[in-house]
A protein has these predicted regions:
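N-terminal glycine-/charge-rich "phosphate-binding" loop or analogous flexible N-terminal tail
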Residues: 1-40
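Residues at the starts of beta-strands that form the adenosine-phosphate
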Residues: 2, 132, 154-155
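Short acidic low-complexity segments
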Residues: 27-37, 48-51, 168-185
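Phosphate/diphosphate ligand-binding glycine-rich loop within oxidoreductases
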Residues: 39-112
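Phosphate-coordination loops involved in phosphoryl transfer and adenosine-cofactor binding
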Residues: 78, 129-132, 213
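Glycine-rich NAD(P)-binding loop of Rossmann-like domains
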Residues: 111-144, 171
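NAD(P)-binding Rossmann-fold cofactor-contacting core
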Residues: 151-168
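Rossmann-like adenosine-cofactor binding region
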Residues: 163-219
């Protein structure tokens, strides 16, 4: 079995070592133009020239959760696409979102400005109930983020295509519930994949339906 590794801006050594250790009988290498066609591709944002040279690939392993760039390319017919659901990205996204939400809630930017200006001004925080967080997309990563935000006792709403049962998260389902979801959101977190249905979903109309003074976290 020949495995071709073609990942933009990704050091190949850890992947090659791991694949060779797990599959000692496989021929694993970094793809170079002119190489023989592979049976399996491990990729991240490969050039179209890579796919044009892979007529027999049976499986494509995308080393990230997002496959929108991949789906925009001409891929080998019949190849199965496998993407990572989490692989460590969940906790990174959760900590990023929680850091941002708490920063807005505690007015860290204003406090930092005051410190730089030599001003001491006490700030009384609003109750957490005034800061509902709305998560768009409740897949593996979205659920991880929603649960993390919950630990800080903020109200959490979630919007998804199909019903999701996450304890403590108020669910809004489908296009008919989207505007209601936005109206109940002060911090909007976007974890939706880029598809024809979600492209440009963040627009003037969408943002105008959020609570006044809302924030958007696009991850």
């Amino acid at each position: 079995m020949k495995i071709a590794f073609c990942c933009t801006n990704t050091p190949p050594e850890p992947w090659l070592l791991g694949l060779r250790a797990a599959l000692p009988g496989a021929d694993v290498s970094v793809w170079q133009p002119g190489d023989a066609p592979a049976d399996v591709a491990v990729v991240w944002m490969p050039p179209q020239a890579f796919w044009d040279a892979q007529p027999r690939v049976r499986a494509i392993f995308n080393i990230g959760a997002g496959v929108d760039a991949l789906m925009a390319q001409r891929l080998p017919a019949g190849a199965r696409i496998v993407r990572l659901d989490d692989a460590g990205m969940g906790v990174q996204m959760a900590e990023y979102v929680c850091h941002a939400v708490i920063g807005y809630f505690r007015e860290w930017a204003a406090i930092d400005h005051d410190i730089r200006a030599g001003i001491w001004q006490a700030r009384e925080p609003e109750p957490r109930t005034a800061w509902p967080v709305g998560v768009m997309g409740l897949g593996v990563l979205g659920e991880r983020v929603a649960r993390a935000v919950q630990t800080f006792e903020f109200p959490v709403n979630g919007w998804s295509r199909s019903p999701k049962a996450i304890v403590g998260v108020r669910g809004f389902v489908g296009p008919e519930a989207f505007h209601d979801f936005l109206a109940h959101t002060r911090v909007l977190v976007n974890l939706l994949p880029l598809t024809p249905e979600t492209e440009n979903i963040l627009n003037r109309d969408t943002l105008s339906r959020l609570r006044p003074g809302a924030f958007v976290i696009n991850v």
